[in-house]
Amino acid sequence: PTHALPAWVGALDLVLVLTDQTYAAEVSATIAEAVRRGARVIVVCPAGSPVAEQAQGRGTTILATQTGDQLAGAMIMLDGLSRIGLGPEVRPDRVAQALDEISQVCSPHQSVASNPAKDLAIALADELPLVWGGSVLAARASRRVAEAFREASGRPALAADAADLVAVIQAAAPRDPFADPFDEFGAVRCTTLVVLDDHRDDQAMARTPLLALAERHDVRVRTISHDQGNDIERYACLLQHGLFAATYLRLGLGSNLTR
């Protein structure tokens, strides 16, 4: 990725910057270039960070965070845009409440029978996950969840559009009912399709044939579903559920938690 501004950015534009303390010098240079061209700049970054200190000026508005979490930064930016009339209404308190509910359902204190994140982690223990989200935000969540699965297991995990997953599902290794589950060297890892479902109508057309294809090729399907609240709340809950599952997967596989 590049931090360079597009050539067309000028005095009539608003530049939005979400950053942690990574690439501070490059991000600061980009902000300075936007200000030099006369653009207004809104920056979401940790309070007291080098970016926050160097971005001070009349042409910039800094929304400080207390964490480097991407979702928290996005919520602050969306709330700020909503307050100045440049975006839909966002209720961070409702998002926080929804995430609290997911944390309770997926809590370590919940048994496997009542904890969907633990159940998903067990299902993926010896599998190669494909992650699909049909809506724009569910697809975004699927990419982050797949990344978390890769880090947790050290194995491939792919997030892609339905059309791109077709060939992967068709080429998936068939399940052998006589395979030795304890044969670490001879066993072929099978594929599981993880569907992130936010109950948006725009994903129904792609979802049905994708699930039918998975069934024909003996690819198991696991669903993370959330249908309450607005689009942002649903996105946050799908993501949090997936990240809980990735954490339990890492614990179950004995992976290095500091990685």
Predicted regions and their residues:
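Charge-biased C-terminal accessory regions appended to nucleic-acid-, cytoskeletal NTPase
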Residues: 212-259
